[in-house]
Amino acid sequence: MQLLTDEVNLLCGASYRPQEGGLYRRAGTEPVRIRTSEGTEFIDKRRVRKMGQDGREQEVRLNSYAEIKRRKGMFEEVLESICHGASGSGVGKMLGVSASQVCEGWKARSRELLAEFRGRDLSEIDVLAMMVDGVFPGKERCVVVALAIDTEGHKHLLDFEEGSSESAEVVMALFAKLKARGLDAGVARRLLVTRDGSDAIAKALRHFWPDAVQQECLVHVERGLCAKLSYKHQAEAVEKMNRLRAVEGAEAGEEAFEDLLKFVSGKNLAAAESLDARKDGILAFHRLNVPATLNVTFLSTNHIENVMRNARQVVGRVSRWNDKTDQVARWMGVALLRAQEGFRRVRGHKELGSLAAALEREGPADLSLHSAAAEMGKAA
């Protein structure tokens, strides 16, 4: 909107200091609708009137208004083209503009989308479960992303945090940011978190939500297990893992786990010891005794990994990242917003009431940001 302001000031003088004897005057504003490649958008159009030689005033057509409409449309086309893999120079040739204008359009629109992504109020989300995962846009650049599932089965991408690795400090900074934005998780009930085997994520969760139910992703468990077994034993291990994924409740889960552990113990001692040490994380969800129709949703981190896969299609095009700018944040903001456009409710969402009931605690817990910060200080 600065373009409009600059042109009006040029014609009429600065606000509250009109040009003496000038032919132009301000005539207020009016809401107008402009059309872009994404649809329509309302802006406040400045109006200017000019005194003619016959003593009558006429509306002045502002050049900046047409330029804003052109730029709005161009920014959206630049965004779409770059996200679909086009180069900056190629987009410039397609739109008939210079490479610098393409760069300007991309930066402007991606900053708007990042502000939109991080400007949302998280306090209205009734969080039932959360998933956390990291994506590596560069060799020394990691972005940790948090996704929430509410009590109605809707998925919400919450925020992300940049770092050099998926460390506990990076994950804690992300959780602190979510708290500061109003995320009210783990208060009305315990929080269910499905995660990979990362010790960093587990540590951060214990600080912010000490009684959270931490479920290890069984896809990661299976992957690690098969890596330790010989090829001829992998098929049977996968079959027993599939049984564990399918059964319902604590008792059936315990039986399926013991069957798997017995099989692995006879094939690889190190794999069996590792599996047994992770038993509580592997069976955490089964011990809630909820319908097995929810297993496919909460026994793996597939929901957030699908988001990460889509995000890599966007950020994977960048060969060199500039840590001194907001480049990583802008690209990730765009990638995550685009990934969220295709979200649907999770499978088994009609059974989430039973999960919410299973996560209830007898009394409220003090899980505020202040108490979490105090715990972090003690650990340090």
Task: Please annotate each region the language model reported.
Residues 4, 133, 155, 193, ...:
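Residue-level signature of catalytic and energy-coupling elements of molecular machines
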